[in-house]
């Protein structure tokens, strides 16, 4: 869906509609809280780009476009918990300067449709993601999905 706006000079502006975009401020607060408790980088994205990020490295990922591979995994409703050297590890961003040591990716589902993802990332070699990080992401994704209904 598209949103149609006009600017002051009367020009028409077309903008792709993002249901998560409506929750950007709220998603930002949720990402802040989750990043603080989990101790990692948290990104909340729609099906195109990051709409909220918090934690160490947030400035590098804010508003970055997600990779086609990630879009495909989300469309298939796949959750991912992977270490950087594992086969199931995927690059999260289209233009990703570095690989992360760990990633946890959970799709956000609203009224039966995938509308985005909650992504937890870590660059810390000493840290190990477990089912706990996956459950934290699932909790956030479930909550955000319900907020958009």
Where are these regions (language model features)?
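A short, aliphatic-rich beta-strand micro-motif
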Residues: 102-109
């Amino acid at each position: 869906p598209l949103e149609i706006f006009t600017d002051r000079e009367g020009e028409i502006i077309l903008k792709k509609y993002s249901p998560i975009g409506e929750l950007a401020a709220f998603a930002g607060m949720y990402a802040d809280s989750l990043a603080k408790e989990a101790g990692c980088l948290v990104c909340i994205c729609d099906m195109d780009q990051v709409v909220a990020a918090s934690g160490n490295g947030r400035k590098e990922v804010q508003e970055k476009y997600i990779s086609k591979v990630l879009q495909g995994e989300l469309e298939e409703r796949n959750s991912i918990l992977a270490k950087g050297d594992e086969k199931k590890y995927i690059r999260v961003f289209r233009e990703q300067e570095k690989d992360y040591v760990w990633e946890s990716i959970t799709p956000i589902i609203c009224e039966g449709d995938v509308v985005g993802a909650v992504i937890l990332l870590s660059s810390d070699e000493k840290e190990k993601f477990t089912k706990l990080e996956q459950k934290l992401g699932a909790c956030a994704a479930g909550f955000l999905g319900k907020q958009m209904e």
